[in-house]
A protein has these predicted regions:
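Hydrophobic, small-residue-rich alpha-helical packing segments that form membrane-like cores
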Residues: 1-51, 55-61, 285-311
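Glycine-rich anion/phosphate-binding loops
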Residues: 179, 208-224, 568-572
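N-terminal beta1-alpha1 cap of cysteine-dependent amidohydrolase-like domains
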Residues: 428-591, 595-600
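Short acidic loop-to-helix transition motifs that present clustered carboxylates
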Residues: 15, 33-41, 84-87, 282-285, ...
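Intein/HINT protein-splicing elements and their conserved insertion hotspots or analogous self-processing inserts
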Residues: 1, 60-195, 202-210, 254-261, ...
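Structured alpha-helical segments in the cores of large, soluble enzyme domains
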Residues: 1, 17-19, 28-43, 182-194, ...
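A glycine-rich phosphate/pyrophosphate-binding beta-strand-loop-alpha-helix module
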Residues: 121, 215-282, 286
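Conserved phosphate/anionic-ligand binding catalytic regions in large, soluble enzymes, centered on
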Residues: 5-22, 178, 226-235, 314, ...
């Protein structure tokens, strides 16, 4: 990355955008651009969408070094443009000049566009008051936990691997029971060595507030994202944002008023918090016949944190106090940014002092959702007392914290404690709730669509030769190393196209005390393949352990995974080296794609 001065990703605009945006003066050579098929004319080469590509700017003197780095990682690299001082974007196809535009003209975006916007009046009501159906407190708590925006999506979430890359600091669900939802994504930075620096990312958006007022909706989207980050133990002060916008089709002044007011609301938060944003994906096509999407400006915020300072949201210890660090909106329902900054800084200080051990940023389900979900993870008894009229209201910016000490702060309201007891009971205003019943209610709505359990599979067919009474005893393999003793075993990890857990596997081996050797199997040219096979054979000959890591390769389907790796293993030189490894008592380990290749 020290060689790269600037970069851009390829997308819908193809070469014209990905390269054209990089600098003022450019000479672009369209005939050099790699294509999937021949016969494209100049226009098609210039504007065709192309994914999975990056454009980078380097100094001319670094060209050979850059190409060498790319080739060593099996990455295709092509010199397709030169930076000039002409202030013009020129495109050539062979010897022909096909485009010659001044940067001044490009930056003007062509003809100027104007649109008239009218910001509509909002309804005269408090948008934070939320009515939850139910005759009793129990009914309301149950209905709140089954709200589509509050109910558990654990079955859906567990369809995705949250551990790949070996960087996850907070799992999606925390606690001994793994049932308290985590509000942020915390990932250690990917590096070949070791680090405690992690990224922490959160989002914010409420379609009901945004429908009432896009201005307020955008402002509270930023507030919600910041609150979640603070509740995880990070500081909001260096957060950076990307806003994702989605609005109805723009047809009149009133429709134009919605993105205008949303952007103004977000901009106000940027200025008052001092937190910049870049634009994200945006669309003005959210209309189908007479159905419109709600005005959407979703805020995604990210910052860095020391992984050791991160706290998870589940309740931790009996006897701890529960405080609501309360945010009180201004008279016009906008966030009180000065109060929020003070609150967030106070919480961050208490987390760093190890006084606050868990926290939950209030969201769709209000305080009732927060205390229920915090109690799920460890099943600890807790008791709170709070005004039932405000229990379910939106309270964005407010954070419920578990503290080991008494908090002396004007906006810290003591509402309860984590109590002694083994009944797993949550008491709200004197009404007792069984925590496991609350969990069942919270997970029930989507359970049939996205189940979080699987029924055991029992085959009624007894395999031939077994009477179903005597247990089948498989011959146990002897997995001990039988070679000569070594002080530091060498583990060799070949990296094939598509391998994606090589870094995490290497760290695991180093932690276990092995010397790790890795080599990338390059296959861009025939010469690359021969060289990679020779290098792989040499490494197998010198290692004590061969590990085939997991991943994905484009040749996997149809007929299953691991075919590319299996073909390499069947090469005579590689096969002979593997047999020699086994003969000298060496060990082989395969995981995921690597294991499937061994089976094949």
């Amino acid at each position: 990355t020290r060689l790269i001065k600037k970069s851009n990703d390829f997308g819908a605009g193809g070469v014209s955008v990905a390269i054209g945006e990089l600098t003022d003066g450019l000479d672009i050579y369209l005939d050099r651009v790699p294509v999937k098929y021949n016969g494209l004319n100049s226009t098609e080469l210039a504007i065709s969408e192309s994914q999975e590509r990056m454009s980078v700017v380097i100094e001319a003197k670094d060209k050979d070094a850059m190409i060498a780095y790319c080739r060593s990682e099996n990455v295709e690299v092509t010199h397709v443009a030169d930076v000039t001082d002409r202030g013009r974007m020129r495109m050539f196809n062979g010897d022909r000049l096909v485009v010659d535009l001044s940067r001044e003209f490009i930056d003007s975006a062509g003809a100027k566009h104007y649109a008239k916007a009218t910001v509509g009046a909002v309804e005269d009501r408090n948008p934070f008051v939320r009515e939850v159906e139910g005759e009793t407190l129990k009914d309301k708590v149950f209905n709140n936990l089954q709200d589509p925006n509050v109910t558990s999506q654990k079955g859906l979430i567990e369809m995705f691997d949250s551990t790949i890359g070996r960087s996850t600091v907070l799992m999606p669900f925390g606690g001994m029971l793994q049932t308290t939802e985590t509000q942020v994504s915390v990932q250690k930075l990917p590096t070949d060595g070791y680090t405690d620096t992690a990224s922490v990312m959160a989002f914010g958006y409420n379609p009901y507030i945004a429908s009432w007022s896009p201005y307020h909706g955008a402002a509270y989207a930023v507030v919600e994202a910041c609150s979640k980050v603070v509740a995880a133990g990070a500081s909001y002060e260096k957060m950076r944002f990307s806003y994702q916008e989605y609005f109805e089709r723009m047809t009149d002044r009133k429709s134009w008023g919605k993105p205008l007011s949303a952007l103004l609301g977000a901009l106000k938060m940027q200025v008052e918090f001092g937190l910049p944003s870049i634009g994200g994906k945006d669309s003005m096509s959210g209309t189908f016949e007479n159905i419109n999407v709600p005005p959407m400006l979703m805020a995604f915020g990210i910052t860095t944190v020391d992984a050791g300072q991160v706290i998870s949201p589940e309740l931790k210890y009996e006897g701890n106090r529960l405080y609501l660090i309360k945010h009180t909106p201004l008279a016009d329902h906008m966030p009180d940014t000065e109060q929020l900054k003070a609150n967030w800084n106070f919480i961050h200080e208490q987390v760093q002092a190890e006084n606050v051990v868990s926290a939950y940023a209030l969201g769709f389900g209000g305080l009732a959702e927060a205390i229920c979900k915090m109690s799920f993870g460890n099943g600890l008894d807790a008791k709170i007392t709070y005004d039932e009229k405000e229990l379910f209201n939106y309270a964005y910016g407010s954070i419920l914290v578990e503290s080991e000490v008494e908090l002396d702060y004007p906006n810290a309201i003591l509402i309860g404690e984590v109590t002694d007891g083994e009944e797993s009971e949550l008491t709200i205003n004197g009404k007792k709730f069984d925590i496991f019943e609350l969990m069942a209610v919270n997970s029930g709505r989507f359970a049939q669509v996205y189940p979080d359990t699987a029924e055991a599979y029992n085959s009624k067919t007894v395999p031939a030769g077994l009477d179903g009474v005597k247990p089948f005893k498989a011959k146990k393999a002897d997995l001990r190393y039988k070679g000569e003793p070594v002080e530091k075993p060498i583990a060799y990890l070949p990296v094939f196209p598509g391998t994606n857990c090589d870094y995490d596997s290497a760290k695991a081996w180093r932690n276990a005390g092995a010397e790790v050797r890795m080599s990338v199997f390059c296959n861009l040219t025939e010469e690359d393949i021969f060289r990679s096979i020779a290098e792989m054979k040499k490494n197998i000959d010198e290692c004590h352990i061969l590990m085939l890591c997991g991943g994905f390769s484009a040749g996997d389907e149809p007929d299953g995974s691991g075919k590319f790796i299996a073909n390499v293993l069947n090469n005579k030189d590689i096969a002979d080296a593997i047999h020699a490894l086994i003969d000298r008592g060496g060990l082989i380990l395969g995981i995921c794609n690597g294991f499937q290749a061994l089976v094949k």
